[in-house]
């Protein structure tokens, strides 16, 4: 882990994060992280952390909006290795982008991640809603954007073992169009306490499930 400029581990947000004006990068744990002042690559590692609070942006205007349960916007210059690594994290909070601009990205874990994103062994069961449609490319539906306009800006991102509760993510505020996930799997709320719903999650040393903890959803043993 020596190469990382920012390491977040065993952290949690349980409160409400709200912004209502200006240029927004909003997340439960990280709002924005990018190049350092000298223009060199930064490396981000977020592990065994979670959000259970509401993360919300309410605004109108032309400013861009990036909102995610764990991080709003993680970006860097082009690099030859994964510079954003998110592992064993989850979101159970609502992610709400009540905006009227045309550039916005909302995701259960990350709103927007630029270049090489490695995300694995994560899940989201929180409601993800965005009000307007916006443009994006190299979209990574599922965990890197439960709303369809969450995105990564590089096609070689590594997304593995990602799960989202069915019915929590929609294409617009009117809840008319459910999101199609390309890199991830749905699980039904009725199966939230079934370890088989979470693929190869490590339930021996990292994750556990108990009916009286975390609403019956998987929780982190070292960060309950």
Task: Briefly describe each language-model feature range.
Residues 1-224:
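Predominantly extracellular beta-rich ligand-binding scaffolds that present long acidic/polar faces
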């Amino acid at each position: 882990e020596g190469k990382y400029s920012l390491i977040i581990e065993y952290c949690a947000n349980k409160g409400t994060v709200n912004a209502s004006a200006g240029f927004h990068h909003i997340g439960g744990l990280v709002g924005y992280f990018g190049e350092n002042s000298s223009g060199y690559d930064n490396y981000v590692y977020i592990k065994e952390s979670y959000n259970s609070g509401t993360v919300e942006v309410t605004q109108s205007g032309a400013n861009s909006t990036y909102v995610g349960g764990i991080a709003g916007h993680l970006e860097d210059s082009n690099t030859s290795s994964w510079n954003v690594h998110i592992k064993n994290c989850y979101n159970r909070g609502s992610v709400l982008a009540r905006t009227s601009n045309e550039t916005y990205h909302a995701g259960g874990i990350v709103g927007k991640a630029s270049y090489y994103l490695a995300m694995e062994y994560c899940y989201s069961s929180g409601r993800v809603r965005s009000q307007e449609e916006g443009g994006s490319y190299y979209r990574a539906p599922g965990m890197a954007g439960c709303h369809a306009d969450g995105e990564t800006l590089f096609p070689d991102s590594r997304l593995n073992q990602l799960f989202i509760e069915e019915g929590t993510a929609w294409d617009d505020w009117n809840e008319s169009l459910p999101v199609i996930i390309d890199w991830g799997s749905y699980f039904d709320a009725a199966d939230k306490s079934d370890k088989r719903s979470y693929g190869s999650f490590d339930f021996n040393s990292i994750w556990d499930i108990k009916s009286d903890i975390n609403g019956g959803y998987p929780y982190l043993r070292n960060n309950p």
